[in-house]
UniProtKB/Swiss-Prot annotation:
Family designation: Belongs to the glutamyl-tRNA reductase family.
Binding-site residues, NADP(+): G180, A181, G182, S183, I184, G185
Gene3D superfamilies: Glutamyl-tRNA reductase, N-terminal domain, NAD(P)-binding Rossmann-like Domain
Designated name of the protein: Glutamyl-tRNA reductase
Domain-level remarks: Possesses an unusual extended V-shaped dimeric structure with each monomer consisting of three distinct domains arranged along a curved 'spinal' alpha-helix. The N-terminal catalytic domain specifically recognizes the glutamate moiety of the substrate. The second domain is the NADPH-binding domain, and the third C-terminal domain is responsible for dimerization.
Described function: Catalyzes the NADPH-dependent reduction of glutamyl-tRNA(Glu) to glutamate 1-semialdehyde (GSA).
Enzyme class: oxidoreductase
PROSITE patterns, per the entry: GLUTR
Note: During catalysis, the active site Cys acts as a nucleophile attacking the alpha-carbonyl group of tRNA-bound glutamate with the formation of a thioester intermediate between enzyme and glutamate, and the concomitant release of tRNA(Glu). The thioester intermediate is finally reduced by direct hydride transfer from NADPH, to form the product GSA.
Length: 406
């Protein structure tokens, strides 16, 4: 039995956004208690991951037929992808990294995998080789987030593009005025806060809306009739209202002497088109293209890193398997020592099993076995799993055959 035989016991059944609608996914959601209650009777380990984009069951066992039955009951088995061994492992690594999400690179999935992992452990459903696999997937997901933060940058939000533009041209310490607290204005305010801007004032015709948005992020707010003074005191002014008439006319802009940067993303335009130098959505599209290209490169690099971590995982997985077998050998060695101690006690050679000589026997057994156990671990790490397995199998054969201790 080689390493691939142990890996083949890792099985995944995944129903996700690539195959079905979110409505079908929601109709397939399982009761967690029922899933674990049933599957833990058939498999060594079980892991259930359910989000708005996926319903996935992972098991460690010889087949996945019992898990399949749960999807059959829901009527979605024909849309389920079945993954075995390293294909299943690769999938959960990519899921945890956000590379299999509907919005590729989104950050919520990593926390969802971690929550599901903790839930499964509390239930006693993880703790062996599958648990080790999920744990490594989470670790890799965190590494991907840390090394490639750009994969989480959104592309479609006007607010994110505005925040990125302002950050590039004026920096985080600039004084910013956001004119409008509707859907676009609110998105801009949120993105500015997420980016780290702190000196922001929100101006809106309905003061209560400006106040609510400002209080949410610790910003300032002002009524629309103070617009001109707010503009004069700002480094960047962002117009994002649905006003039908321009809020800033050319004669007003002439008084500003070009001091603030004017950004107009209002629909229709909030700024007189005759005012030169106004930044519009067209200029912001250039940033969007840059972000998209940067994100594509980051995703490619993240995928390559995952493949490297999978190579490392396979080596560590082999070591885990060997360590489990080593545990059995250790118990065998200690049992021999304990048997000899009991014989010595019975013969009156030592007082009891806690006698100094008895403890010395146990310590000696551990020391004698240590070089062998260390060697076996090293073989597993050096991708010589089969060689380590032959040695262990040979020892077991001797124990169960002519070399068995009496």
């Amino acid at each position: 039995m080689g390493i691939d035989d142990y890996l083949s016991k890792i099985r995944a059944l995944t129903l996700n956004h690539k195959r079905v609608s979110t409505i079908t996914l929601s109709e397939t959601y399982f009761n967690r208690d029922e899933v674990y209650g049933k599957l833990m009777n058939y498999y060594d380990e079980v892991f259930l991951l359910q989000t708005c984009n996926r319903v996935e069951v992972y098991v460690y066992g010889d087949d996945d037929s019992v898990a399949e039955d749960m999807y059959k009951v829901k009527g979605t088995i024909n849309h389920v992808d079945k993954l075995v061994g390293m294909n299943a492992v690769r999938h959960i690594f990519r899921v945890a990294a956000g590379l299999e999400s509907a919005a590729v690179g989104e950050s919520e999935i990593l926390g969802q995998v971690e929550d599901a992992f903790n839930d499964a452990r509390k239930r006693g459903a993880l703790g062996g080789l599958l648990g080790f696999t999920i744990e490594r997937a989470i670790r890799t997901g965190k590494e991907i987030r840390s090394r490639f933060p750009e994969i989480s940058i959104g592309l479609a939000s006007i607010g994110s593009l505005v925040a990125e533009y302002v950050h590039r041209v004026r920096g985080l310490n600039s004084r910013i005025a956001v004119i409008g607290a509707g859907s676009i204005g609110s998105d801009i305010v949120r993105r500015l806060a997420e980016k780290g801007f702190r000196n922001v004032i929100i101006v809106n015709r309905t003061l209560d809306k400006a106040k609510a948005a400002a209080l949410r992020y610790g910003f300032n707010y002002a009524p629309i009739d103070s617009l001109r003074s707010v503009i004069r005191d700002s480094d960047v002014v962002i117009f994002a209202t649905s006003a039908t008439n321009p809020l800033l006319r050319r004669r007003d802009a002439e008084e500003l002497s070009g001091k603030p940067i004017i950004i107009d993303v209002g629909v229709p335009r909030n700024v007189d088109p005759e005012i030169p130098g106004v930044v519009s959505i067209d200029e912001l599209k250039n940033i969007e293209n840059e972000i998209r290209e940067g994100k594509r490169k980051a995703l490619d690099e993240a995928s390559r890193l995952i493949e490297l971590r999978l190579i490392e995982y396979r080596r560590l997985f082999a070591r885990r398997v060997i360590e489990g077998m080593i545990g059995e050998l250790t118990k065998w060695g200690l049992s021999i020592g304990e048997s000899e101690v009991k014989r010595a006690v019975k013969a009156g050679l030592i007082k009891n099993e806690e006698d100094g000589a008895a403890l010395a026997v146990k310590s000696t057994v551990k020391k004698i076995m240590l070089p062998l156990l260390t060697y076996l671990k090293e073989l597993a790490e050096e991708d010589k799993f089969d060689e380590a397995l032959i040695i262990i199998s040979g020892i077991k054969a001797k124990l169960n055959g002519d070399g068995k201790q009496s």
